[in-house]
Amino acid sequence: MKYSLCTISFRHQLISFTDIVQFAYENGFEGIELWGTHAQNLYMQEYETTERELNCLKDKTLEITMISDYLDISLSADFEKTIEKCEQLAILANWFKTNKIRTFAGQKGSADFSQQERQEYVNRIRMICELFAQHNMYVLLETHPNTLTDTLPSTLELLGEVDHPNLKINLDFLHIWESGADPVDSFQQLRPWIQHYHFKNISSADYLHVFEPNNVYAAAGNRTGMVPLFEGIVNYDEIIQEVRDTDHFASLEWFGHNAKDILKAEMKVLTNRNLEVVTS
């Protein structure tokens, strides 16, 4: 397993892509997960500078692991526009040399879907997968509240319903734990489809609401309860023990304050724990 940082961690800071690349390199990250809006802006407004930086990534043993975006598959959406966005993302992913696109399976909980509505979403997800398959790219659905992948049973059911080889999973361990499932058991059941992990933690289940989109994307949002991996309620020692031999990236998805300080400290702790495992 390798570690990546998320550019979304710097969503409220004035920091360049060049600075993020250098920070990742200096602190032992091997990948960068690009937020979709960052990828689009770099392509449209910083093309030449970003092109030079991308050409240097390999020398720094870095890569763009995934573009994380949001594809609207709701029945009220203009699906033609969603397909157009998919085509744009394929262009971006090709430029950034990644084959993974993260999105969500809708915007409401799986229990709130009628069978007919669920089938319409399944059809749309399959069409999106088919489009990206033409570019040899994968669609990663994130396990997340208020989506069709908000529980382990619904996630497994959805994978079977869509039944497309280019549909994969970004396993967010905190959110699968939030659903009431055991994180390690969820990993074992979803393992054939997993292509990426999100690591984050919370001090108490009482604060899970701080990860709701309206709060987490707000510059003045509440960050209470957001803590480093090994200071929270989810047992990451157990999780890392289980997944460390897999060949996937785990993004440290930090949404709180002081992103550089926290990420730097997290990598030191992770490196030290890995060395302890190797030498024990």
From Swiss-Prot:
<dbReference type="InterPro" id="IPR013022">
    <property type="entry name" value="Xyl_isomerase-like_TIM-brl"/>
</dbReference>
<comment type="pathway">
    <text>Siderophore biosynthesis; petrobactin biosynthesis.</text>
</comment>
<feature type="binding site">
    <location>
        <position position="198"/>
    </location>
    <ligand>
        <name>Mn(2+)</name>
    </ligand>
</feature>
<feature type="binding site">
    <location>
        <position position="253"/>
    </location>
    <ligand>
        <name>substrate</name>
    </ligand>
</feature>
<protein>
    <recommendedName>
        <fullName>3-dehydroshikimate dehydratase</fullName>
        <ecNumber>4.2.1.118</ecNumber>
    </recommendedName>
</protein>
<dbReference type="Pfam" id="PF01261">
    <property type="entry name" value="AP_endonuc_2"/>
</dbReference>
<comment type="pathway">
    <text>Aromatic compound metabolism; 3,4-dihydroxybenzoate biosynthesis; 3,4-dihydroxybenzoate from 3-dehydroquinate: step 2/2.</text>
</comment>
<feature type="binding site">
    <location>
        <position position="172"/>
    </location>
    <ligand>
        <name>substrate</name>
    </ligand>
</feature>
<feature type="binding site">
    <location>
        <position position="142"/>
    </location>
    <ligand>
        <name>substrate</name>
    </ligand>
</feature>
<dbReference type="GO" id="GO:0046279">
    <property type="term" value="P:3,4-dihydroxybenzoate biosynthetic process"/>
</dbReference>
<dbReference type="GO" id="GO:0046565">
    <property type="term" value="F:3-dehydroshikimate dehydratase activity"/>
</dbReference>
<feature type="binding site">
    <location>
        <position position="142"/>
    </location>
    <ligand>
        <name>Mn(2+)</name>
    </ligand>
</feature>
<keyword id="KW-0479">Metal-binding</keyword>
<comment type="subunit">
    <text>Homodimer.</text>
</comment>
<feature type="active site" description="Proton acceptor">
    <location>
        <position position="144"/>
    </location>
</feature>
<comment type="function">
    <text>Involved in the biosynthesis of petrobactin, a catecholate siderophore that functions in both iron acquisition and virulence. Catalyzes the conversion of 3-dehydroshikimate to 3,4-dihydroxybenzoate (3,4-DHBA).</text>
</comment>
<feature type="binding site">
    <location>
        <position position="253"/>
    </location>
    <ligand>
        <name>Mn(2+)</name>
    </ligand>
</feature>
<feature type="binding site">
    <location>
        <position position="217"/>
    </location>
    <ligand>
        <name>substrate</name>
    </ligand>
</feature>
<dbReference type="InterPro" id="IPR036237">
    <property type="entry name" value="Xyl_isomerase-like_sf"/>
</dbReference>
<feature type="binding site">
    <location>
        <position position="175"/>
    </location>
    <ligand>
        <name>substrate</name>
    </ligand>
</feature>
<feature type="binding site">
    <location>
        <position position="70"/>
    </location>
    <ligand>
        <name>substrate</name>
    </ligand>
</feature>
<keyword id="KW-0456">Lyase</keyword>
<feature type="binding site">
    <location>
        <position position="102"/>
    </location>
    <ligand>
        <name>substrate</name>
    </ligand>
</feature>
<dbReference type="InterPro" id="IPR050312">
    <property type="entry name" value="IolE/XylAMocC-like"/>
</dbReference>
<feature type="binding site">
    <location>
        <position position="172"/>
    </location>
    <ligand>
        <name>Mn(2+)</name>
    </ligand>
</feature>
<dbReference type="GO" id="GO:0046872">
    <property type="term" value="F:metal ion binding"/>
</dbReference>
<keyword id="KW-0464">Manganese</keyword>
